[in-house]
Structures are given as C-alpha cells and as structure tokens.
Amino acid sequence: MATQKETTRKRDKSVNFRLGLRNMLAQIHPDISVQTEALSELSNIAVFLGKKISHGAVTLLPEGTKTIKSSAVLLAAGDLYGKDLGRHAVGEMTKAVTRYGSAKESKEGSRSSKAKLQISVARSERLLREHGGCSRVSEGAAVALAAAIEYFMGEVLELAGNAARDSKKVRISVKHITLAIQNDAALFAVVGKGVFSGAGVSLISVPIPRKKARKTTEKEASSPKKKAAPKKKKAASKQKKSLSDKELAKLTKKELAKYEKEQGMSPGY
C-alpha cells in the first residue's frame, strides 16, 4: 500500500488575541458575530496596544531596575489612553491584579481565569518580554497588560457592534470597526488611522439631498403637450328688432313681406 504524505502546516508564531476577542464579543453582543478579516484587525489593534504599553512601561522604570512591574504598566496605560479612558482602564487593571493576587495560590485554572479576564495573560506577558526590552516580567505586570488591552477592546467591540446593528447586519465587518473608532474621539486619539491595514475605509457623512422639482426629460421636451381646443362659443341668436305701427305703415309691400318673413310671421295678404 502506498503511504499517504502528511501535510504539515507552519504554525503562526506571532502573538494574536483572536480567541479572547471572540469570547468578549459573545459577552458584549451575544446576537452579533464577527467576520474573519474584522477579527484579524481587532487582534492587530490589541497587539498594537500591547506593544505601545510595553514600550511605555520600560521608559517609566527607575534606573537600575530590570523587572517590569504592574505599577509601570498602570502608568504607561494611563498615559496612552488619556484622561477619561485612562482613569477607567487603571481601575479595571487594579481590580484584575487584585483578583489574581487573591486566587494566585489556587492550582486550578489559567492566569486569565484567575484574574477573570478573556484576554490571554500568557500572550500579554510574551509581548512584554519581546517589546519591553526586559527579560524579567512580574506576574502582576502581565495581568495588568491583559486587563488594559481587554478594557480598550471592550469599548471598540461595543461601538462596532452598535454600528453593525444600525446597519442591520449581524456580523461585524472592518467598516464597522473603522466607523466605531473614527466616531469616538478618545479611541481615535489612541489608535488613529495607522492600524487598519486590511480596511482603509474612510466613511464620510453626506447630508441627505433635498427633493427637487421634477425635470422634464428630452422626450417630454420634444413632444410638448397639446393645447386643449377652445370651447366653441354658442352662436348668439340675433334678436330681430321689431318695428312700430308707424314704421310698418311706411314700408312697401316687398319690404313688409321681408320683415314678416324675418320675424317668422305669416305674410299678410
């Protein structure tokens, strides 16, 4: 028997958060799904945030410190997200680190489940190690980064799902993600236009045109409507002027006969 050749697939070694984002969408919008291309773009945004926060956390470390801790990640995320988003994000990150610390001794479940997060803590730690410039990363720092990514992506998923629902769609597309970020000033300030490699769809609001008077077509212009024929005027019956007896006496016989004929009188003989 001839042996069948086994085809092997090269494993993608790049970090992605597709699984966690699917789980987040199921919680935020249970009745809406996401297209494969849109899910890849969402994962790219999450990786972009992880890299930016990792670089920021390293710059905030004191001199001589070789370990990235949760405090540095908190400061970097708050600085990247701005005033409003940063305040809420830091609160969620602190809660996640606290939950993980209380459930750390338990051997059951992953680090993400202990912190009650959908974004993978292990993949967030990998981003910190690869792009943070430090080989030492504390467990709290990885949890804080995962919580920071999850908070921001939760905002994006909520707005993108609303945009899909407004468009009467049941699947989120790249266009809905673009629309969600462009219409929110805080999200757009963080992400901007540089992430949408597969989309690049710029939606411009166009006012609804007003209804204009109907224009005549060339066919209608070439054959104008026929004018209605004027109504025929009824011929007014001429009233014959009747003569007095004195005037009749002056008439000759021929004139009198003519007059009587016009008046419809029988001739007098």
Swiss-Prot record:
GO MF annotation list: DNA binding; protein heterodimerization activity; structural constituent of chromatin
Induction pattern: Expression of viral histones begins 2-4 hpi and continues along the infectious cycle.
Top-level division of the source organism's lineage: Viruses
Locations listed in the record: Host nucleus; Host cytoplasm; Virion
Swiss-Prot/TrEMBL GO biological process terms: chromosome condensation
Pfam families referenced in this protein's UniProt entry, alphabetically: Histone (PF00125)
Keyword entries, A-Z: DNA condensation, Host cytoplasm, Host nucleus, Virion
InterPro entries: Histone-fold, Histone_H2A, Histone_H2A/H2B/H3
Region (Histone fold): 1-168
Signal sequence region: none
Entry comment, domain topic: The N-terminus is similar to eukaryotic H2B, whereas the central region is similar to eukaryotic H2A.
Name listed for the protein in its UniProt record: Histone doublet H2B-H2A
Originating species: Melbournevirus
Lineage: Viruses, Varidnaviria, Bamfordvirae, Nucleocytoviricota, Megaviricetes
